[in-house]
From Swiss-Prot:
Species per Swiss-Prot/TrEMBL record: Arabidopsis thaliana
Tissue note: Mostly expressed roots and flowers, and, to a lower extent, in stems and leaves.
The protein, known as: High mobility group B protein 4
Gene3D superfamilies listed in its UniProt record: High mobility group box domain
Region (Disordered): 1-41, 105-138
PROSITE patterns to which the protein is assigned, alphabetical: HMG_BOX_2 (PS50118)
Induction notes from the record: Up-regulated by cold stress.
Main location: nucleus
GO biological process terms held by the UniProt record: chromatin organization
Length: 138
């Protein structure tokens, strides 16, 4: 073993690392209706820069090259040059905050019918429906 560790010490370290992290496959699913976070000023700049860069370099397929060139230009820009991108990012941020508030109100009011059924498994819902149909036939 490396570093003078015994085999028992190595396995106990592995066990500690396994128990600390989250279990694989237990990710919580994100709501597709949840508003996306707004881009920062740099990413607003990057949207415009990509268009210019792709027109100037149509054969470039490397995302890294575009990112490096954009980063270099962003660092070279003055605060006055960055101001329109910062303003646009701020406006998107305020719009995002409004959207999140509306989204949270919608969740709190419980207008989402899908959430009401999510507590029951599909088989429980199907059984309840079939029992209701059987009662209606009588």
């Amino acid at each position: 073993m490396k570093g003078g560790e015994s085999k028992a010490e190595a396995t106990s370290t592995d066990q500690r690392l396994k128990t600390r992290g989250r279990k694989a496959g237990k990710k919580t699913k994100k709501d597709p209706n949840q508003p996306k976070r707004p881009p920062s000023a740099f990413f607003v700049f990057l949207e415009d820069f990509r268009k210019e860069f792709n027109l100037a370099n149509p054969n470039n397929k490397s995302v890294a090259t575009v990112g490096k060139a954009a980063g270099a230009r962003w660092k070279a820009m003055t605060d006055e040059d960055k101001a329109p991108y910062v303003a646009k990012a701020e406006s998107r941020k305020t719009e995002y905050i409004k959207n999140v508030q509306q989204y949270n109100l919608k969740l709190a009011s419980g207008t989402n019918r899908e959430e009401d059924d999510s507590d029951k498994s599909k088989s429980e819902v199907d059984e309840a429906v079939s029992e209701e149909e059987a009662e209606d036939d009588d």
